[in-house]
UniProtKB/Swiss-Prot annotation:
GO cellular component: nucleus
Gene behind this protein: TGIF2LX
Family to which this protein belongs: Belongs to the TALE/TGIF homeobox family.
Polar residues bias: start-end ranges: 10-39
Protein name: Homeobox protein TGIF2LX
Organism taxonomic ancestry: Eukaryota, Metazoa, Chordata, Craniata, Vertebrata
Amino acid sequence: MEAAADGPAETQSPVQKDSPAKTQSPAQDTSIMSRNNADTGRVLALPEHKKKRKGNLPAESVKILRDWMYKHRFKAYPSEEEKQMLSEKTNLSLLQISNWFINARRRILPDMLQQHRNDPIIGHKTGKGAHATHLQSTEASVPAKSGPSGPDNVQSLPLWPLPKGQMSREKQPDPESAPSQKLTGIAQPKKKVKVSITSPSSPELVSPEEYADFSSFLLLVDAAVQRAAELELEKKQEPNP
């Protein structure tokens, strides 16, 4: 009887010892796996977070660097002395400043240059300055062309036709020389009259072909003067009553 009693006890004891372990193992496995996954997620997230912190510079430092780049946007390559000065202002290392400028020249500088081209105020200022310089150059060239006003320029004043009576009084020849003048007038060919019309801004000579009517008018005046001289000569030759 004792042996029979001991036999079932021995057969039941392993089942009783193993069954609780088998029933608890799935729950323990899932909890362990979830903890392991959470730990691995934290481990993977830490380097990313650290990288983000490394890439972000202080906003004040970035503003100082951007201002410097905008002032020197046409030559955004700071020297060693300028890097040292920026390092003191921004509290950044020389390596950080060099890396920032390398990236900024590719990403920020093109936008700055495009904004400078599209800004109407800057374009108006540059156009106004160019117009002022053009005016200064033209003002400097005008005196050289016109020259100083003096007695030499008085001689190049326009010649206007005088009235017939005044011309006859001034050019009235002597009675004795009237026949000789008539002969010379017939023998000599017609001379071209050169007329120069000038103004202070354009001292250019005018060709006589443009004023052909004016030259014929002068020839008519000369003929009238000669006729008047002939009439006076005839009056003098007539006997007094």
